[in-house]
Regions:
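Structural alpha/beta core scaffold segments of enzyme domains
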Residues: 2-419
C-alpha cells in the first residue's frame, strides 16, 4: 500500500533549496537487478521484437520503445500514440519501454523540440508495418486475400465477419517480413484514433503517487553518494585541500580531488573536490566542512560589469544588418509618443528543479549508468573515452527527468559519476 505524507509549500521550498547541487551515486559491487523497482519499464523476458520500436508479447501486449528522454513534455506518451495509432493497437494493451543509449535509434539528443518533427514519419511506418504483419498472418490463417482483412483495435476482421485478436496472431505475424516502408499504406488523417488527440500522460499516476523513478531515486544496497565542491571561478584549480574535518563526519567514506578540465571548458566536468558518503546528508555536511584554497585561473579577472558594458558597446556600434526595410530610426524619432526601456539579463542559468544526477555501476570491465540525461549516446562516448574502454562497454539507462532545458544534454555529470 502506498504511503502518503503532508508536504506544505514552506517545507517543500526549504527541502527543494537543499537540492541545488550535483548529486551522483557510484557503486562498485552488486548487479543491475539490485536497483530498486520502479525504474522505467524494461522489455519482458518473453517479448519478441517486430521492428526497431515495436515488440510483441504472447499475451498480446505491445511494447513501444521510446528512444527519447521524458522531461515533462510527454514524449513517451506521444511516441506511443503515433505507433499505436498506425498499428491499430488497443491503448490499454500498450506498454512504453524506455530505450537505452544505442546508435541503432539514430539521434537520441532530446532537445530543440525535434522529437516528433524528426521521427513521426518513421514511427508511423513502424506501427503500420506491424499492422501489415497482423493482417497477413490472419489472411494466411484463413486462406484469404490480405486485402479482404482489416485491422481495428487489436484484432483483424475478415469481410465475412471472422475475427482474430492480435494475441492469437503474434506467433504467426512474426514470421512475416513486411516490405519496405514506402510500400505500406499509412492511415489518412481522418482515420487517426490517437494522433492529434489529447491523451493522459502515461507516467502521470506514478509521478503524483511518488512511484516514478528519477535519477536520484536509483539505489542499490552498496551505493555511495557523491557531491562536489566546485571552484568559485570557472576553470579554477585546487591549490590546497584540508579534508580532515570532512572525513571526521559520520558517514563520509572518502574525499577525492577531481582535476580541472584541459582545453576549452565547454561542457567538460569542471573539477573540484568530491565528498563520497553513505548518504546524501553526510555528503552535504562533508562538503560544508571542506577547507579548500583555489587558484582562480585565467577567468579570475572576469568582471561582469565590464562584460555588460562590452555588450552595450557592441549594440551601439555599426553592425551588419540581417534584414533592413524602411527607415526605422527616422520613424521612431518622428513619433509623437515614445516609450523607451532597457532590459538586461545575465547569462542564462539552466537550473531545472531536479539537479543533474547520475549513478554508475562498475562490473567486469564495463560500466552501467542511470542518468537524467537528454543525450545518452553522448554519455556513452564521453565515459568510454574517459575510462579508456570501448563504447559498447558503456550502458546508459535513461530515467525520467525533472526538467532539462538542454542542460542535461551534456555528458559532464555522467562522466563525473563514472570518474
Amino acid at each position: 500500500m502506498s504511503q502518503y505524507f503532508d508536504m506544505n509549500r514552506r517545507r517543500f521550498l526549504k527541502t527543494s533549496a537543499a537540492a541545488g547541487a550535483l548529486v551522483m551515486g557510484t557503486y562498485f559491487m552488486g548487479a543491475a537487478s539490485r536497483v530498486l523497482a520502479g525504474v522505467l519499464a524494461q522489455p519482458a523476458n518473453d517479448t519478441r521484437q517486430a521492428n526497431l520500436f515495436v515488440a510483441l508479447r504472447p499475451d498480446g501486449v505491445v511494447e513501444v520503445t521510446c528512444h527519447r528522454s521524458e522531461m515533462g513534455q510527454q514524449i513517451r506518451t506521444a511516441i506511443a500514440q503515433i505507433v499505436a495509432d498506425e498499428m491499430e493497437a488497443d491503448w490499454n494493451m500498450v506498454k512504453v519501454i524506455q530505450g537505452k543509449g544505442d546508435p541503432k535509434y539514430g539521434d537520441q539528443n532530446t532537445d530543440g523540440s525535434r522529437s516528433i518533427r524528426y521521427n513521426m514519419q518513421r514511427l508511423r511506418e513502424m506501427g503500420a508495418s506491424v499492422r501489415y504483419m497482423m493482417q497477413h498472418a490472419a489472411a494466411a490463417r484463413w486462406g484469404v486475400a490480405p486485402d479482404t482483412c482489416s485491422a481495428v483495435q487489436h484484432k483483424v476482421t475478415h469481410t465475412s465477419g471472422k475475427t482474430l485478436s492480435y494475441k492469437e496472431l503474434v506467433a504467426d505475424a512474426l514470421t512475416f517480413t513486411p516490405p519496405v516502408s514506402e510500400e505500406i499504406p499509412l492511415k489518412d488523417k481522418s482515420e487517426w484514433r490517437y494522433i492529434n488527440t489529447g491523451m493522459a500522460h502515461i507516467d502521470l499516476h506514478d509521478i503524483v503517487t511518488g512511484k516514478a523513478t528519477f535519477a536520484a531515486d536509483v539505489r542499490t544496497p552498496s551505493a555511495l553518494v557523491a557531491v562536489i565542491l566546485r571552484p568559485p571561478v570557472v576553470g579554477g584549480t585546487i591549490k590546497n585541500v584540508d579534508s580532515a574535518a570532512a572525513k571526521a563526519i559520520k558517514g563520509v567514506v572518502d574525499v577525492v580531488e577531481i582535476p580541472a578540465p584541459k582545453g576549452a571548458l565547454q561542457f567538460q566536468p569542471k573539477g573540484g573536490v568530491a565528498v563520497i558518503a553513505n548518504n546524501t546528508w553526510a555528503a552535504w555536511q562533508g562538503r560544508k566542512a571542506l577547507k579548500v584554497e583555489w587558484n582562480d585561473g585565467a577567468n579570475g579577472s572576469y568582471n561582469s560589469d565590464a562584460f555588460k558594458q562590452q555588450l552595450l558597446d557592441t549594440v551601439n556600434s555599426p553592425q551588419s544588418h540581417v534584414r533592413e526595410k524602411g527607415d526605422a530610426l527616422a520613424r521612431l524619432n518622428n513619433a509623437d509618443d515614445k516609450l523607451m526601456a532597457d532590459y538586461y539579463v545575465p547569462h542564462l542559468a539552466q537550473a531545472p528543479m531536479e539537479p543533474p544526477c547520475a549513478t554508475a555501476l562498475f562490473s567486469n570491465g564495463a560500466v552501467e549508468i542511470w542518468a537524467a540525461t537528454q543525450n545518452p549516446q553522448a554519455d556513452m562516448a564521453t565515459v568510454a573515452a574517459m575510462l579508456g574502454i570501448e563504447q559498447d562497454k558503456v550502458t546508459v539507462n535513461v530515467t525520467l527527468l525533472g526538467g532539462g532545458f538542454g542542460r542535461k544534454s551534456k555528458p559532464d555529470f555522467s562522466a563525473e559519476a563514472a570518474y
